[in-house]
Amino acid sequence: MGCRCCKMIQSYLFDPVQVPSPGFVNEVNNCKLEEDDTVRLKGTQNSEVEVPGSTLHSGSLSKPDSSGSTTGLPCQGSLTQEDSEERPCVEKHGIVNGIRPTATLQSVRSPRPQQVDSVSWASSPWVATIDSAHPAQPFLEGEDYRKQSCMLPTLEGTQMVGHGDSRAPAEALAVADHIPYIPAPDYPQVWSPEVDNVNPEEKDCLFENHSEVEPLPGIHPRVSQQGLSMPFSLKRSWDSLNEAGTTEVLSVYFKEEDPTQPTPVADPGNEREDPHTYNGNKEGAVVDEDAEVAEALAALEAATAGEDADDAD
């Protein structure tokens, strides 16, 4: 089985720390030997462990009971030289039970208890890694310590993700470099300042249309036209327009009633007169239109008077 297993057991006796093996289920972390177990350590190079025959198991290690009973140690008979020679052969292949020695030291220090059979535990190269991370280094020899120091630099380049899934940090950097960059749109946005500054007159066309509408004289806008939901400034503009329209209509009527204005000659038999309508916004235009209408009415009445005279004859 080799000296590493003995050193591991010795480290568990003096300073038990939860150090599971990567990729395996190890239940040896909570293992404690009772006083009746006879353990004899011989040297540091060729140490042996004597365990009573009642604790030997042919299968994997079992989980210790909650009452603190003894747990079988990974021992399958006496340690021979053939077993020690087979162990380096297994380590040269680099793969133990389908798991490569590329897992990191972080997974070795995870506190989750795991199980492992005695053969795979003995042939696993992670025993040296556990010993290097364990505080019981005075029991290590110079040769084993050099092997462990050579193994640690190969593990620093990888990191553990999840359970047994290792990824290199270079892959993460490569993925970060390939993130697609989305350029800014070249077309103007809906509410961008460029669109607002294109034509500021169109922006306020709604309010300008309300302010430019002028009501007819004498006709007050309805409540729906004034709008109960209109802002206060627009309501004031409606009131001012109504007042201006009424004053303008009164001034036009006063000018029409002036005696200096030429009056049409009307037939007493036909006293029909068209009411004057509001056809303009300025006083000069209204007066000119009234004069033209009066002349047209006079000519029409003269023609109708001649026809009436012919009918009388």
Curated annotation (Swiss-Prot):
Q: Which residues carry this modification: Phosphoserine?
A: S60, S107, S237, S240
Sequence positions bearing Phosphothreonine: T104
Q: Where is the composition biased (Polar residues)?
A: 70-81
Which Pfam families does this chain map to?
DUF4699
Region entry Disordered: which residue ranges?
A: 42-95, 253-288
Principal location class: membrane
What GO terms describe the biological role, i.e. biological process, of this protein?
regulation of cell cycle
User: Keyword set for this entry?
Assistant: Cell membrane, Membrane, Phosphoprotein, Tumor suppressor
Molecular-function GO terms, alphabetical = RNA binding
Provide one Gene Ontology cellular component: plasma membrane
Q: Where in the cell is it found?
A: Cell membrane
Q: How does the annotation summarize its subunit structure?
A: Interacts with KEAP1; this interaction prevents the ubiquitination of KEAP1 by TRIM25, thus protecting KEAP1 from degradation. Found in association with PDCD10 and members of the STE20 kinases, such as STK24, STK25, and STK26.
What's the stated role of this polypeptide?
Acts as a tumor suppressor. Acts as a tumor suppressor for colorectal cancer cell proliferation by targeting KEAP1/USP17/ELK1/CDK6 axis.
- State what protein this is by name: PDCD10 and GCKIII kinases-associated protein 1
| Native organism | Rattus norvegicus (Rat)
Q: Which gene encodes it?
A: Pgcka1
